[in-house]
A protein has these predicted regions:
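Sec-dependent signal peptide recognition
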Residues: 2-11
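Boundary at the C-terminal end of the N-terminal hydrophobic targeting segment
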Residues: 22-23
């Protein structure tokens, strides 16, 4: 063998601490205090799980692999992604595990900082500069906060469905407060066992009617219209600053890029762990549904925070996880 080639091969084996003898296991270490330019061994861990996955992919299926993660919160903006041929085998599995009993969290969210006091017990924070997602969930101190809604509890009732029984209905005077920014408003209407969640297009305050951006209820089956189950179906409205009046409620003004939140009396705004989601999934495995997905194990890891945005034309549930396709 050419001596230069031999030297290069030995360098990579030593530098990356990779043992390729039969029966051995490849171990890559990750720490929040690591460095993605390091070799990933015990004394020189990598910083991100993504880099660890990238480094081991050429060896997946050839020997057992463990990505060992030290205590900490690891934030991702896109899911950890694998193809069907990158998932190990029965003899050579891929494991992504916490080190000993360390607390390891993989989070698809971004923490909010620098809250400012507004009036009426409300605090606000500006969205991160590079954050461009729409979202409808805010996590505060490890719980899902309540999106500002009206009424706070129970429901309103439709006075009468509009002529097409699909895209608009009438309401009673003073049913809900006058909303300044209708473009941020969402309607949630109950169809017996399912719901429609859809953006409001306009509100005619003179004629007391509300119109949505598309059909309320799934287009098929055809009976998913406004008044099929109840002549005066239940509904509530979400995401208006006028509704943000109770502890634990929040509202987002997407035009101003600001979130408003009403803390509970026992919450210190400076210690608030408020997270908005960014990653649409946490783990994504590509492949045909009939393919063997391989052998990948996650052990001792907590997964938190994902972003699911309702379709632009609305989410209309049907049954058994089926919903109206409006892509």
């Amino acid at each position: 063998m050419n001596k230069n080639i031999l030297k290069i091969a030995l360098f990579f084996l030593l530098y990356f601490n990779i043992q390729i003898f039969p029966g051995d296991e490849l171990k890559i270490y990750v720490s929040v205090n690591g460095n993605d330019n390091s070799n990933g061994n015990f004394d020189s861990p990598l910083k991100t799980i993504q880099k660890a996955i990238e480094n081991v992919k050429p060896s997946i299926g050839k020997l057992p692999i463990s990505i060992i993660i030290s205590e900490g919160n690891y934030r991702i903006e896109m899911p950890l992604e694998f193809n069907a041929d990158e998932l190990g085998s029965v003899d050579n599995p891929l494991k992504i595990i916490s080190r000993n009993t360390d607390s390891v969290v993989i989070s698809g969210g971004i923490k909010l900082k620098n809250w400012k006091k507004e009036s009426n017990g409300i605090w606000s924070v500006t969205l991160p500069e590079n954050y461009s997602c729409k979202f409808n969930t805010l996590y505060v101190n490890d719980r899902r906060a309540i999106r500002a809604r009206f009424p706070d509890k129970d429901y309103l009732h439709v006075k009468k469905a509009g002529e097409d029984n699909r895209t608009n209905f009438f309401f009673e005077k003073n049913d809900f407060p006058n909303v300044n920014k209708v473009s941020n408003l969402e309607l949630v209407l109950l169809h017996d066992w399912s719901i429609t969640r859809i953006c409001v297009k306009e509100i005619d305050w003179e004629n007391l009617s509300l119109k949505t951006v598309d059909s309320i209820g799934a287009r098929s089956p055809a009976f998913f219209n406004i008044s099929n189950w109840e002549p005066n179906p239940r509904y509530f409205l979400e995401n208006a600053i006028e509704f943000c009046n109770s502890p634990g409620e929040w509202y987002c003004d997407f035009e101003q890029r600001k979130i408003y939140y009403v803390p509970f009396p026992n919450e210190d705004i400076n210690e608030l762990n408020a997270v908005i989601p960014i990653s649409p999934q946490l783990v994504k495995i590509n492949g045909d549904r009939l393919q063997d997905r391989g052998y990948i194990n996650f052990e001792g890891i907590t997964f938190e925070h994902t972003n699911w945005v309702i379709p632009e034309r609305g989410y209309c549930g049907i049954q058994a996880c089926m919903y109206d396709n409006r892509e």
